Amino acid sequence: MDEQAGPGVFFSNNHPGAGGAKGLGPLAEAAAAGDGAAAAGAARAQYSLPGILHFLQHEWARFEVERAQWEVERAELQAQIAFLQGERKGQENLKKDLVRRIKMLEYALKQERAKYHKLKYGTELNQGDMKPPSYDSDEGNETEVQPQQNSQLMWKQGRQLLRQYLQEVGYTDTILDVKSKRVRALLGFSSDVTDREDDKNQDSVVNGTEAEVKETAMIAKSELTDSASVLDNFKFLESAAADFSDEDEDDDVDGREKSVIDTSTIVRKKALPDSGEDRDTKEALKEFDFLVTSEEGDNESRSAGDGTDWEKEDQCLMPEAWNVDQGVITKLKEQYKKERKGKKGVKRPNRSKLQDMLANLRDVDELPSLQPSVGSPSRPSSSRLPEHEINRADEVEALTFPPSSGKSFIMGADEALESELGLGELAGLTVANEADSLTYDIANNKDALRKTWNPKFTLRSHFDGIRALAFHPIEPVLITASEDHTLKMWNLQKTAPAKKSTSLDVEPIYTFRAHKGPVLCVVMSSNGEQCYSGGTDGLIQGWNTTNPNIDPYDSYDPSVLRGPLLGHTDAVWGLAYSAAHQRLLSCSADGTLRLWNTTEVAPALSVFNDTKELGIPASVDLVSSDPSHMVASFSKGYTSIFNMETQQRILTLESNVDTTANSSCQINRVISHPTLPISITAHEDRHIKFYDNNTGKLIHSMVAHLEAVTSLAVDPNGLYLMSGSHDCSIRLWNLESKTCIQEFTAHRKKFEESIHDVAFHPSKCYIASAGADALAKVFV
């Protein structure tokens, strides 16, 4: 029966509990089979199809979220990279622009120096090949310059580290001794002729010419005496110290080529200025000029030979070839040595003092170096310096101090500066020199200590051009009159941060509204409690000024408006207030000037020019030197002085105008000097003229602007005049010298008009300007 058993039998035999269930009945076997099926179903429930789908959906959603976060992060990083790249590009552009500016300024400075030298000495200043700066090559070589800069930086750091090591072990003194010995060998104090000539040949190969070696040898033989050798030792120690100076940037850049620098050039560059500064030295050296002259003829034949042969020929053939008495030369040399010793008793200091001197020299600013071409004209060798040596002056200075540094040990820095050969006034030449076109010298002018005015506030609330402005006599308060039919009052101490800049803006604290047309003029009383305005409506409105600290949003106060002064039938162009009599002067397009009593609203006290004999008045002012007089300008070009008490015209100022008036002779403004009997007029033909009130004669006339002069103002002390013009400029003038001491552009043009009015504050440090661009600007 076992062969025909079903699958359950085999499964039961394989089960661990099959033996126990085998002897049981059918019920037990059914129960056991049911338990096995339940266990298998529980195991399969963990991986059901809905569960798997849910898991996949959950993982997909998490993956999508992470990918979205990654995309956002990548976008942020890309934006940051783009921002940094843009910032880097902007910095590079800024650097290029600054480099171009530096090159431009360097080129301009070289031109100015050459021009100054030509004017002073009448000769061209040899500055090498001076070409205008080129910018295209800089951009092309930018990629090549960066690796060089990195290598130069590493080279400089390595030199700095090596310098510290040498200083720690005390090797600096050894270098000084070795170099001093080498200099003595080069200058002919050593008996090793072969080594000396080898050095000269090596120097000549570096320089590309052999004539310089002979020239240096001749100069050294004729000039170096005992005291001169002491000074040369000083100079050599200076050059050694310059090797270890942090200030020598050129030496760091060209450090790899330092070993092949032309030492003969160093000796010659130092010997020439020192030997050329003493008159006795020049006279003594003139005795040896024939040596140099004879040597010039042999340059060509000697250039192909060996350096050692030259020296031997010089030593052997000197007496025969030149036919000179050697005793005379020896006598001259001894005499020259005695004179030098008598003049300069220089004792060589010990090493510690010398090191202190060198340390002090590092703290002092480097003295200006001399071009070899500026040397004494009596020295033939000075004019025979090769051109490429002059061009390499900066490169040579990487190993040396300036030519006069040896004298600075003895004379001091200031005296050494004054004794620079041929330098003269060039010692004071700086980049800050003013242009030659200026007609005045600021340095010698007593205005050098004057105040410089700078813009402080921009008043922006008007909707049309501002025609006039007036300061409060005491408070920092300004009133402006505009073509938008309003006047506005500004407290210059109540500032608020501007919206789009770091500057401060001022908001108006009160707006005066009563005019029915553009307001053309405004004036304040002497105590600042009232102000008066005139406009195209022919009315003169009187106002009570409000408290400067008033809230701009307070309710309307009807007591501010005092009422109009009626009488004019056309636009009122100008007003002037008399503090002595509390009177108000006005001039109108109806051709009349009127005098008003400001204490009451009544008809005018007096009327002037009612017949329009002089034309239409354009401006009026009180004569400060005589309170009973007033001065007025007219459209026909006349300026007259009137007596307000007698109502008579007492004087007409001198004017060269035709009877047929035209726009070119129009006078836009007349003012009176606060302390002197002088009247000043601003003309349409760009002139400013000064008149004597006593005689009516013209004192001075000058073209002050590029376009019509529209406004004038004199400071309370009577020292400076301010003028405004339609050329958009404000100019400040010294009344004593009649020269412009400051100019600034304040406004933009509108309908070919720019600046309408300017004013000084009577007691505080403010000036203001009114423009056709609806802006008023305040300067401090």
Swiss-Prot record:
Residues 55-63 are annotated as: Caveolin-binding. Pfam families: Striatin, WD40. Residues 124-150, 289-310, 365-387 are annotated as: Disordered. It is a peripheral membrane protein. Keywords: Calmodulin-binding, Cell projection, Coiled coil, Cytoplasm, Membrane, Phosphoprotein, Repeat, Synapse, WD repeat. The keyword Calcium does not apply. InterPro entries: G-protein_beta_WD-40_rep (IPR020472), Striatin_N (IPR013258), WD40/YVTN_repeat-like_dom_sf (IPR015943), WD40_repeat_CS (IPR019775), WD40_repeat_dom_sf (IPR036322), WD40_rpt (IPR001680), WD_repeat_striatin (IPR051488). GO terms for biological process: bicellular tight junction assembly; dendrite development; locomotory behavior; negative regulation of cell population proliferation; regulation of signal transduction; Wnt signaling pathway. Part of the core of STRIPAK complexes composed of PP2A catalytic and scaffolding subunits, the striatins (PP2A regulatory subunits), the striatin-associated proteins MOB4, STRIP1 and STRIP2, PDCD10 and members of the STE20 kinases, such as STK24 and STK26. Interacts with CTTNBP2; this interaction may regulate dendritic spine distribution of STRN. Activation of glutamate receptors weakens the interaction with CTTNBP2. This is Striatin. It comes from Homo sapiens (Human). The lineage of its organism: Eukaryota, Metazoa, Chordata, Craniata, Vertebrata. The gene is STRN.
